[in-house]
């Protein structure tokens, strides 16, 4: 029995790095891109290459940006006194869709997960602490997910910032326990922000 070409194996292995994509899904995607949608494959490869080339992390909020400081952080209409901490860019996007928050953000790009080797240092919490204690921020709103890891992250951040005299609040549990902001409707997120509590 002959094995597939090594370039095909490499493509399938590369697609498996995506979240939720197992070997069968990766194989189906590879075959589809190569056989049915070569233009789409070329566009995907080009867009990914371009994004890797031009995107970096904003120096203030840690979100993806093409500039040293992203447009949101540079916007003088945003309230610099409140800093909302989220796990991922998708969480920030969901909060923005509610149109109920006008402060600034800090994107952790993950959450504490000791079993996966992600501790405070790996998450870069020292950058968050520096940002939250820069003199502009009056309140930090913790909007991490209501999962075990999200709760542990919120608790750790609250402890670190509270020890430095920073006012810390937590979004309300209008977001379902075990739920993730990315999969929550905007009305629920808006209510959770309005009904946040001290943490």
UniProtKB/Swiss-Prot annotation:
Molecular function, one GO term: zinc ion binding
Q: Which keywords appear in this protein's UniProt record, sorted alphabetically?
A: DNA damage, DNA recombination, DNA repair, Metal-binding, Zinc, Zinc-finger
Q: Which domain of life is it from?
A: Bacteria
InterPro entries linked to this entry: DNA_Rcmb_RecR, Rcmb_RecR, Rcmb_RecR_Znf, TOPRIM_dom, TOPRIM_RecR
List GO BP terms, alphabetically: DNA recombination; DNA repair
Looking up SMART domains in the UniProt record yields: TOPRIM (SM00493)
Which SUPFAM superfamilies does UniProt cross-reference here? Recombination protein RecR
Which segments does the record annotate as C4-type zinc fingers?
A: 58-73
Q: What range(s) does the Toprim domain occupy?
A: 81-176
| Annotated family | Belongs to the RecR family.
Briefly, what is this protein's role? May play a role in DNA repair. It seems to be involved in an RecBC-independent recombinational process of DNA repair. It may act with RecF and RecO.
What name does this protein carry? Recombination protein RecR
Q: Which organism is it from?
A: Azoarcus sp. (strain BH72)
Its lineage reads: Bacteria, Pseudomonadati, Pseudomonadota, Betaproteobacteria, Rhodocyclales
Q: Which gene encodes it?
A: recR
């Amino acid at each position: 029995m002959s094995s597939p070409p090594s370039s095909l194996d490499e493509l399938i292995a590369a697609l498996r790095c995506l979240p939720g994509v197992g070997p069968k899904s990766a194989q189906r995607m590879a075959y589809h891109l190569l056989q049915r949608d070569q233009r789409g494959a070329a566009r995907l490869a080009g867009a990914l290459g371009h994004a890797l080339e031009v995107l970096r992390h904003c120096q203030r909020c840690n979100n993806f940006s093409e500039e040293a400081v992203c447009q949101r952080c540079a916007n003088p209409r945003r309230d610099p006194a409140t800093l909302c901490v989220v796990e991922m860019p998708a969480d920030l996007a969901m909060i923005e869709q509610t149109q109920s928050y006008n402060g600034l953000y800090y994107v952790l790009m993950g959450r504490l997960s000791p079993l996966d080797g992600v501790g405070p240092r790996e998450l870069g919490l020292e950058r968050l602490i520096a940002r939250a204690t820069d003199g502009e921020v009056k309140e930090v709103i913790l909007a991490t997910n209501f999962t075990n890891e999200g709760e542990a992250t919120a608790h750790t951040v609250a402890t670190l910032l509270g020890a430095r005299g920073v006012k810390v609040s937590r979004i309300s549990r209008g977001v379902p326990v075990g739920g993730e902001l990315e999969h929550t409707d905007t009305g629920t997120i808006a209510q959770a922000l309005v009904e946040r509590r001290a943490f």
